[in-house]
């Protein structure tokens, strides 16, 4: 093939049949007899004809790719037609698939302490980091709409799941995406500094300018069933905060044992 033939535009009419779907762009090719066109796919789609859609949730990601393990994945947001990063956990608790909606270090608490979950405060959705991460409100809400449970963990990035300093509840009992509340709520399990309670009521608070958390001093005074965590709690200045807010901290609580300690909040669904 001479130079003139190489520079001649390729026209084989393969793109006339519009083989690329979901907004994909077709380019004709004359260099390979077996591959006469190429599809450049729109964001969120892939495959020979752009016929496959990227996963939009952790559950879908793990279902589409049976070999997928817990880790950071790129998910497709159909509302904005963009990709974003999130940590999916399908291993730590048998029967559950969890989506991380927030993670922050005690050092960065000042950026999260006044952010209720029903407020929009996205952080590092395109470049995941355990020390400062949160999904946007629309993405958290979409995740909540397909979830059944809520949990909070400490230092998951360095220690994985430990049931000391941990909470789990049904979203029907603690609707963290809407709840403006200070009082007793039902938990499936809650543990603070080694004290724990199963299928009981315990303190939960989230206000317009207070991050969701529990208080080991004031909570037991509200008539909740879980009261043993008051033993050894830091009382001054305002009562020990656990899993967020952190105006008064206890170094025995794993989420606040050092400035590099991290707190995670997750939304989850049972695996079927």
Question: Predicted segments — roles?
Answer:
Residues 1-272:
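Mature extracellular or lumenal effector domains of secreted proteins
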């Amino acid at each position: 093939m001479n130079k003139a033939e190489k520079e001649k535009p390729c026209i084989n009419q393969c793109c006339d049949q519009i083989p690329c779907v979901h907004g994909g762009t077709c380019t004709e090719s004359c260099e390979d007899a077996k591959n006469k066109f190429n599809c450049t796919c729109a964001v969120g789609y892939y495959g020979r004809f752009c016929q496959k859609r990227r996963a939009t949730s952790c559950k879908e990601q793990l279902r589409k790719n049976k070999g997928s393990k817990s880790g950071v994945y790129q998910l497709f947001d159909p509302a904005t037609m963009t990709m974003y990063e999130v940590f999916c956990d399908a291993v730590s608790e048998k029967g559950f698939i969890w989506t991380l909606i927030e993670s922050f270090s005690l050092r960065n608490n000042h950026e999260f302490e006044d952010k209720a979950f029903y407020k929009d405060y996205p952080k590092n959705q395109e470049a995941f980091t355990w020390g400062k991460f949160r999904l946007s409100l629309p993405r958290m809400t979409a995740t909540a709409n397909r979830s059944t449970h809520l949990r909070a963990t400490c230092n998951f990035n360095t220690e994985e799941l430990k049931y000391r300093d941990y909470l789990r509840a049904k979203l029907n009992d603690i609707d963290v995406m809407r709840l403006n509340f200070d009082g007793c709520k039902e938990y499936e399990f809650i543990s603070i500094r080694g004290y724990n309670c199963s299928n009981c009521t315990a303190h939960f608070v989230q206000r317009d300018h207070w991050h969701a958390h529990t208080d080991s001093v004031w909570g037991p005074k509200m008539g909740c069933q879980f009261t043993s965590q008051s033993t050894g709690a830091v009382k001054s200045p305002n009562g020990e905060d656990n899993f967020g807010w952190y105006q008064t901290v206890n170094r025995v609580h794993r989420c606040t044992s050092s400035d590099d300690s991290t707190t995670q909040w997750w939304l989850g669904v049972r695996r079927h």
